[in-house]
Amino acid sequence: MSWSILEFLRKNPEELKNNLKRRAIDVSLVDKAVELDKKWRQVLQEVERLRHQHNVLSSQIPKLSGEERKKKIEESKNLLKILEDKEKELEKIEVERDRLLSTLPNLVADDVPNGPDDSYNIPIKFWGKFKVYEGDVEEFLRQTKDANVNYEIIKWKPKGHAEMLEDVLHLGNTLKAAEIAGSRFYYLFNDIVWLDFALLLFAIDYITQQGYTLVLPPYMLRGEVIQSVIDLDTFKDAIYKIENEDLYLIATAEHSIAAMFFKEEIEKDKLPLKFAGISPAFRKEAGAANKDLKGIFRVHQFHKVEQFIFSTPEDSWKYHAELITNAESIFQQLELPYRIVNIASGDLGACAAKKFDLEVWMPAQAKFREMVSCSNCTDWQAFRMKIRYVDRKNNKRGYVHTLNSTAIASTRTITAILENYQREDGVVEVPKVLRKYLEIFPKAPKDYIYPLKNKII
């Protein structure tokens, strides 16, 4: 089975153009790719004809003798030279065609909302009881229109997570971190650090109980690999490159896990392969220059647990639903109220055919903020990484489908806890589901996180 985009290119290029239009991308790329593929197939026919001629000629030579034999040998050598030149031409065209095709984003799923940006994203589900400050009720109802959500009005204004972290609890310091490392770095202390690790332990405990294999992956990848996993031309300003090395720091364990079978074949009867990766995540956040400058919501480094699945094409949508269900279960157990959003075509990113975001309500900000991104990348990554499945029973090969979803991004989830679990006196309740991961440590918080009287630094 060939790559889905290549199939569309040959069978229905207009549909491929429509897909690019849904993403607001120049459709002339399709015309260029069609011409290259047409040329490739023409040269392929010539190569196959020359191979056949050479094989026929080679089979005749042993039966000949004398001058006729010498003549056929010379003819065979000349034909072989022509064949080798044509094969090089074929390879060159194929590389050029595949390079162009690799710049194309994934095919957008039919049920993805059309629209150029995130204002066209569609909320499809709400869960939990939402705490809403009395001055924000109108804004909350605007964001949850016609959803019939359950909410309670509170009379005191919750403090933002940045203020809670640094000025109330005195358990974080971003100013000092900025002095020594730059903006979007942080120092976290004591109870917040315990909370970070409790979230990670909870996530890997839950996900592995669902049958996922726990993996600690490489934190760096070679350039050839990372540009197969992501659209590096678009995201080169979002990820860190090691100076004078062909190595990039990963932005998520998804990158390393996706490359686990780089240029390999997987037996079909071994699919699906499900992994839970835990790693730091390193991000430049270059495109977010003026967003979330305070606090730890949008930072250059954080800890993350990632879900990842290698699937057969026919089962990938089933597993996409499984991934978001797992993520929902985690946030339901944390009792953090959220909504699920179906991401619009122009906001998808190149890899994904469809993406759900899980966004938690932040009462201090009076808005929903992204905590989880859950994508079906179908065969987009697999084609670029040359990861195929083998069905020996039916003598078939095809590209696997790859899927990924956040389980927990630690710092973002901490911001949600600080805003949703704070009391008016500044005390923060520890979510009940996390307490068993903290009770084994004498110095860890058990039920509540209390403000310190003095700053640590």
Swiss-Prot record:
Compartments, as annotated in UniProt: Cytoplasm
Pfam families for this protein: Seryl_tRNA_N (PF02403), tRNA-synt_2b (PF00587)
SUPFAM superfamilies given in the database record: Class II aaRS and biotin synthetases, tRNA-binding arm
GO cellular component, one term: cytoplasm
Keyword presence, Ligase: yes
Record keywords, A-Z: Aminoacyl-tRNA synthetase, ATP-binding, Cytoplasm, Ligase, Nucleotide-binding, Protein biosynthesis
Catalytic activity: tRNA(Ser) + L-serine + ATP = L-seryl-tRNA(Ser) + AMP + diphosphate + H(+); tRNA(Sec) + L-serine + ATP = L-seryl-tRNA(Sec) + AMP + diphosphate + H(+)
EC number from the UniProt entry: 6.1.1.11
A GO MF label: serine-tRNA ligase activity
EC class: ligase
CDD domains: SerRS_core
UniProt record, GO biological process: selenocysteine biosynthetic process; seryl-tRNA aminoacylation
Binding site for ATP: R283, K284, E285, V299, E370, M371, V372, S373
Binding of L-serine, residues: T252, A253, E254, E306, T406
Pathway annotation: Aminoacyl-tRNA biosynthesis; selenocysteinyl-tRNA(Sec) biosynthesis; L-seryl-tRNA(Sec) from L-serine and tRNA(Sec): step 1/1
PANTHER family referenced in this protein's UniProt entry, alphabetically: SERYL-TRNA SYNTHETASE
Domain comment quoted from the record: Consists of two distinct domains, a catalytic core and a N-terminal extension that is involved in tRNA binding.
Subunit structure: Homodimer. The tRNA molecule binds across the dimer.
UniProt family annotation: Belongs to the class-II aminoacyl-tRNA synthetase family. Type-1 seryl-tRNA synthetase subfamily.
HAMAP family linked to this entry: Ser_tRNA_synth_type1 (MF_00176)
Protein role: Catalyzes the attachment of serine to tRNA(Ser). Is also able to aminoacylate tRNA(Sec) with serine, to form the misacylated tRNA L-seryl-tRNA(Sec), which will be further converted into selenocysteinyl-tRNA(Sec).
Classification via NCBIfam families: serS
Name of this protein: Serine--tRNA ligase
